[in-house]
Amino acid sequence: MAPIKKRNQQNQPNINERIRFPKIRVVDADGTQLGIMAPSEAMEIADERNLDLVLVSDKADPPVCRVMDYGKFKFEQEKKAREAKKKQHTSDVKEVKMRYKIQTHDYEVRVNHAKRFLKSGDKVKATVTFRGREIQHSHLAEALLKKMANDLLDFAEIQQAPKREGRNMIMYLSPKK
């Protein structure tokens, strides 16, 4: 059975007295190697400088520890995580709706909307809706969607070919990488 960890120690890295290795490689705050020594010696060095001993890599042989200010280190890590989160872009699915009897100008407007969506990194769902007996002309809707895919060839690749779903014909486009 695994030992029970205290709640506040679960996700914290090994620092200071929590480092339980017979020998460790110690690196100074500015990156200079201080050598291989016992953790107690490294703790004395860290205490002299009013800094913490932080385990950086336990996979190395011997494990690598750094003498640094742990509070500052933790703040920097959180700051990097926030920056990385800001730079992430989640791609949404934007929809462009039309009918198969669409006029030329209206069609061009829909294509321009789709271009804008694709340039911003979003996927596009092109939908052609049918009303009443229009569903008999699904081949015209398929031709329209293929024309749209052809017009957007520079910006998109077809993720899902035109497919009929109920009273709609749908095609998915994703931005080119």
From Swiss-Prot:
The positions making up the signal sequence are: none
GO molecular function annotation: ribosome binding; translation initiation factor activity
**Gene Ontology biological process terms, A to Z:** ribosome disassembly
* Keyword terms: Cytoplasm, Initiation factor, Protein biosynthesis
Instruction: Name where it's found.
Output: Cytoplasm
Which cysteines form disulfides? none
InterPro entries hit by this protein: T_IF-3_C_sf, T_IF-3_N_sf, Translation_initiation_fac3_CS, Translation_initiation_fac_3, Translation_initiation_fac_3_C, Translation_initiation_fac_3_N
Q: Which GO terms describe its cellular component?
A: cytosol; membrane
Q: Which domain of life is it from?
A: Bacteria
> How is the quaternary structure described?
Monomer.
Q: Which family does it belong to?
A: Belongs to the IF-3 family.
Briefly state the protein's biological role: IF-3 binds to the 30S ribosomal subunit and shifts the equilibrium between 70S ribosomes and their 50S and 30S subunits in favor of the free subunits, thus enhancing the availability of 30S subunits on which protein synthesis initiation begins.
Protein's name according to its UniProt entry: Translation initiation factor IF-3
What organism does the record attribute this protein to? Acaryochloris marina (strain MBIC 11017)
The gene designation is: infC
